[in-house]
Amino acid sequence: MCKVLIIEDQLDIIDRFKGFAADTELSFISPTDIGLVGFSPTEDEAVEEQLATFLKNKIGEHGIDLVLLDTDLSRGRTLQTHSSYKAALRELGMPVCRYQKGGTTSEFEQLPQLQRTIRDGASAIWIPRAIVSGDRMHELVPRLIAISRGFKAIYEALQASPELLKGRHSPTDVLAAVLGNSAISYEFLGYAAQNLVYFANPEAHVAEYQISEEQRFATQLGYWLFNYIMMFPGPILSEPSAAAYLNIQPSELKKHSELSEALKVAQYHGPFSEIAPYFWRSALIELLNDFDGDIVRNEAFRDLEIARIDTQSPDSVAYICLVSGKPITEQQAAPTPDWVPSGASEARVDDDVLSELGPLAGI
């Protein structure tokens, strides 16, 4: 069973989300269920610290695995501010998913997600708007379950190897150990520039509020893995990025089961892999070697009509634009923006998109 505390001030939204969770392994716990609506802070201590104490007790009492936090809590006027909950939950080291309802779709659908992740990736996993208030709401419960399992897998790995939290182990070393292969830690060095943000140590007066050191570090490691490493393709690639790496149109994987079956040997099975298929770039390289450098021209798939992204240079690597989500060739890709981690070698933005965005492209 996965228990999710939803901090939302609109009762109809809570009821709707609970309806989606009916007959699943997930159950939503509302602010009313834990007495959060009646919580009244005193003037003797900061609101955030009082909330941290209150939430720590309730999370333990109800066995809460994950918190789902709305960014706008101003309508019901029965809860504290979003920023207060955000700060309190970060002091606890509790995994959080945040969301913002409403809004319209855009051709640059990935841009808001990128902006939020870069700005607040060290404090929450963002749920896309379409999943909380659009045409993909049926994806909410499975996504929350997968996210909760991801954090839990990291936490259990740290519990099983307590030495990882002692001594001079870097986040790259710990992540490699959690993923079951200490030899791959170098793959994540290019993502270490933001480690001071993702792995900031709590101040002395705040440390007493954390649920546990293992929980705090598991949450930090989870944010870094999902929001930074898996968001910006490099050693771990999303399914579209994996197809592009092989210069194959992503839609071809659904058309040809033989093709998707061949890629399974390269599939990533670590934390958060249940959210969507991901693949190891190193395993894709081995796969290319097995298929003489090009899957499409290999004898096993010669009878299939497989569409390429770059039709002019079949041997080239292609990409998925970080902003539009569409396939692009190497010639269409702009120079890598400075907000992309140096380790994200497969992360590119369409040059035309970058020009159209103008100042927004600075994120």
Positions of predicted regions on the chain:
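Conserved acidic segment of CheY-like receiver
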Residues: 1-33, 67
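Beta-sheet entry/capping signal
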Residues: 3, 95-96
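Short, flexible coil/linker elements and helix-boundary hinge sites characteristic
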Residues: 21-25, 56-63, 93, 180, ...
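Conserved phosphotransfer microenvironments
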Residues: 39-91, 101-109
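Short, solvent-exposed polar/charged micro-motifs at secondary-structure junctions
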Residues: 39-42, 136-142, 176
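Alpha4 helix (beta4-alpha4-beta5 surface) of REC/receiver domains from two-component response regulators
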Residues: 76-91, 97-163
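C-terminal output/effector regions of signal-responsive regulators
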Residues: 145-363
